[in-house]
Amino acid sequence: MGSTFTGLSGKTKEDFGHGKAKFITYMNVFSNPLANLDMTESVEIDLNQNCVRKGDVFFTTSSETPEEIGMSCVMSENAENLYLNSFCFGYRPTEKFDLNYLAYVLRAKTFRNEMIFLAQGISRYNISKNKVMEIKISLPSFEEQNKVGQYFAHLDHLITLHQRK
């Protein structure tokens, strides 16, 4: 159903804060069901890095509490020269999903409980990429995914509008 990929690797602090490329930050993945392209930072890139694409899913791999492990974020648009931070891993599906559906189902309580169960650690928690890939999610027809995804995207939009008041 897809393959995993790593975030940035082999970087030093001198590579960050400048450069023609951008990367999706840990907080972007942690905070947003759909990647926010305004929450990217500059990085100097070499040839051996993985570009992100529309449809990719990102997961945080480390946190201070089990409840915050494995937060997910979906890349819902195309962007050039964009990469993933080194504290996350990516998943590139080979099947077609409604991206809004995927974004919200991966943050639903049932999926989050699976992630919490997989958290390993005492003062710092980590998660196994291989174990995450074993988790099953409900996949209705694409048409139904689209309806559910649109519903939650609209609901999220209404909540955002209400919070601005």
Task: Specify the residue positions occupied by each region the protein language model found.
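Flexible, active-site-proximal loop/turn residues at the rims of small-molecule/cofactor binding pockets
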Residues: F30, E64, S141
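Non-catalytic DNA-recognition/assembly elements of restriction-modification systems
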Residues: M1-S9
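Amphipathic alpha-helical segments
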Residues: L102, K136-K165
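A short beta-sheet element
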Residues: T25-Y26, S42-R107
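DNA target-recognition patches
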Residues: K11-V43
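A short glycine-rich beta-alpha junction/loop motif
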Residues: S9-T12, N81-F87, A119-N146
